């Protein structure tokens, strides 16, 4: 049996961080945490782009557009959806996560989820550089780890259109 895992190595990588402006008191630290983690693992600062979108709902379409450019090795999506008194939370959180997963699947590129879905602002702040760490940084490190795993164990196939 063979076992493989990746390490969060950033040298030579080009990463896009797509961040939601809504709840910016939380999302700015998430985006900053992602960028800091990427640079800390060797991604050149000039190889990181940060795209700001209005809200979490717009994260999937922006990630798809970024990946369609073929400029990026991975995407890190960060945002915060905080529960209110209506079912809006469930729709936005679920469909945003689904859209990001579909982008990853469709483009065969890691898209990591730094989307906080919390009941309160305090819970979100605790996960955006507070007592529970920075989930933007965690998502960035996960992207690098998956890329390294792919390099080590799951290289892309160079098939022609006939699958040969």
UniProtKB/Swiss-Prot annotation:
<feature type="active site" description="Proton donor">
    <location>
        <position position="88"/>
    </location>
</feature>
<feature type="binding site">
    <location>
        <begin position="85"/>
        <end position="86"/>
    </location>
    <ligand>
        <name>(2S)-2-hydroxy-3-oxobutyl phosphate</name>
    </ligand>
</feature>
<keyword id="KW-0808">Transferase</keyword>
<dbReference type="InterPro" id="IPR034964">
    <property type="entry name" value="LS"/>
</dbReference>
<feature type="binding site">
    <location>
        <position position="22"/>
    </location>
    <ligand>
        <name>5-amino-6-(D-ribitylamino)uracil</name>
    </ligand>
</feature>
<feature type="binding site">
    <location>
        <position position="113"/>
    </location>
    <ligand>
        <name>5-amino-6-(D-ribitylamino)uracil</name>
    </ligand>
</feature>
<dbReference type="GO" id="GO:0000906">
    <property type="term" value="F:6,7-dimethyl-8-ribityllumazine synthase activity"/>
</dbReference>
<comment type="pathway">
    <text>Cofactor biosynthesis; riboflavin biosynthesis; riboflavin from 2-hydroxy-3-oxobutyl phosphate and 5-amino-6-(D-ribitylamino)uracil: step 1/2.</text>
</comment>
<feature type="binding site">
    <location>
        <begin position="56"/>
        <end position="58"/>
    </location>
    <ligand>
        <name>5-amino-6-(D-ribitylamino)uracil</name>
    </ligand>
</feature>
<comment type="similarity">
    <text>Belongs to the DMRL synthase family.</text>
</comment>
<dbReference type="Pfam" id="PF00885">
    <property type="entry name" value="DMRL_synthase"/>
</dbReference>
<comment type="function">
    <text>Catalyzes the formation of 6,7-dimethyl-8-ribityllumazine by condensation of 5-amino-6-(D-ribitylamino)uracil with 3,4-dihydroxy-2-butanone 4-phosphate. This is the penultimate step in the biosynthesis of riboflavin.</text>
</comment>
<feature type="binding site">
    <location>
        <begin position="80"/>
        <end position="82"/>
    </location>
    <ligand>
        <name>5-amino-6-(D-ribitylamino)uracil</name>
    </ligand>
</feature>
<feature type="binding site">
    <location>
        <position position="127"/>
    </location>
    <ligand>
        <name>(2S)-2-hydroxy-3-oxobutyl phosphate</name>
    </ligand>
</feature>
<dbReference type="GO" id="GO:0009231">
    <property type="term" value="P:riboflavin biosynthetic process"/>
</dbReference>
<dbReference type="GO" id="GO:0005829">
    <property type="term" value="C:cytosol"/>
</dbReference>
<dbReference type="GO" id="GO:0009349">
    <property type="term" value="C:riboflavin synthase complex"/>
</dbReference>
<dbReference type="InterPro" id="IPR002180">
    <property type="entry name" value="LS/RS"/>
</dbReference>
<dbReference type="InterPro" id="IPR036467">
    <property type="entry name" value="LS/RS_sf"/>
</dbReference>
<protein>
    <recommendedName>
        <fullName>6,7-dimethyl-8-ribityllumazine synthase</fullName>
        <ecNumber>2.5.1.78</ecNumber>
    </recommendedName>
</protein>
<keyword id="KW-0686">Riboflavin biosynthesis</keyword>
